């Protein structure tokens, strides 16, 4: 790495970041077990990983785990507000190129995505570790643009315009770059629901040119990170952002998937009166039987003190909803992208910045709303994201997925798959001792009776936890 081969806010924060890293390691037993298991065999030797995932302290432990088992790495954040600057500095100080600053512009964000594919020796990456599929999309859209430049001519949003400009800039600087880079990729492991949905859409359209592992739908990711992580980090973000008393307030959670379930529990645990919106009758019934009132936002927006989106969809909270809410209603999103709330429709109104990632927007009638993190992930923009322990489970899945794709690429086709059940159970097993959990062990007779082995796997792939 050259002296300039990183972009962080302040490299002087590295010592502070290292102290927090040391604490996080004690809460991330899965990643530490991976270092112990694979340090000798070095299964990722030769892997050149372009990583795009929130540059937090927990991610720093993931990065150093990948490095410890052989990988070369270049890293950027997957959200303009989610970087913890001391974490980025700690990683950069070790010689790993990282390009991440809290509060990036969109131009900087896409410049940094490009940078994770620009190795000093000029050779391409051969692996992607992604969160939201932006890094994957950058290479795939770029390779299509090298065949047909017209696809860059009609951006639909401001961010897409900036995205297309960065692709064009790289095409001009390095002709053929995207096509060569796409051909070199062995596989991608994807962290989040939104990114997985994008990959499945690419597969459906026949546009996925390499294997992908859906880390999000590992049970030890979606049923833990998405649920229990949000349960702790949502109210943390709201409180840090607003200092508002949550108890007694009416909160509406849009969506009751795993993230919605954790978010509703988070707000309920803080004393809020929680309502839920849903499109899916199964999830709606679950919410009702968990004790929440299931409503339509068109009818219920006027009752809300807090509205949180969790869906991964667009236009969930529209301008007409925001016109109905109470004065000083808090709006926030804990889904991946910023289009769940129609933030663009608010841009022509007066904005008052209260503090970083907290804005007050005033409507013509004088009513005000508080918007957290400009509609992006509030738990990472206004707070520090999920706790280390739950992220250890998610990131252990990422390590195992990278090893699978890099060492066993010939066993995978250009489709989206999930990790095998035995590896999912392994991830859980690695986290039991830290909580003092003692498993019951099946006898041979008991195992035979239910059709499993005493060592597992214990559930069929179709089992819903």
Curated annotation (Swiss-Prot):
Subcellular locations according to the entry: Cytoplasm
PROSITE patterns: ADOHCYASE_1, ADOHCYASE_2
Cofactor binding summary note: Binds 1 NAD(+) per subunit.
Native source organism of the sequence: Bartonella tribocorum (strain CIP 105476 / IBS 506)
Gene3D superfamilies the record matches: Adenosylhomocysteinase-like, NAD(P)-binding Rossmann-like Domain
Protein residues bound to NAD(+): 192-194, 226, 255-260, 278, 313, 334-336, 379
Major location category of this protein: cytoplasm
Name of the protein in its database record: Adenosylhomocysteinase
Alphabetical GO biological process terms: L-homocysteine biosynthetic process; one-carbon metabolic process; S-adenosylmethionine cycle
Gene name per UniProt: ahcY
Catalytic activity, EC: 3.13.2.1
Residues annotated to bind substrate: 56, 131, 191, 221, 225
Family statement: Belongs to the adenosylhomocysteinase family.
Keyword Phosphoprotein: no
Biochemical pathway: Amino-acid biosynthesis; L-homocysteine biosynthesis; L-homocysteine from S-adenosyl-L-homocysteine: step 1/1
Function: May play a key role in the regulation of the intracellular concentration of adenosylhomocysteine.
GO MF, one annotated term: adenosylhomocysteinase activity
Cofactor(s) needed for function: NAD(+)
Top enzyme class: hydrolase
Disulfide-bond pairs as recorded: none
Listed Pfam families: AdoHcyase, AdoHcyase_NAD
Gene Ontology CC: cytosol
Catalytic activity field: S-adenosyl-L-homocysteine + H2O = L-homocysteine + adenosine
InterPro entries the record matches: Adenosylhomocyst_ase-like_sf, Adenosylhomocysteinase-like, Ado_hCys_hydrolase_NAD-bd, NAD(P)-bd_dom_sf, S-Ado-L-homoCys_hydrolase_CS
Entry keyword set: Cytoplasm, Hydrolase, NAD, One-carbon metabolism
UniProt-listed HAMAP family: AdoHcyase
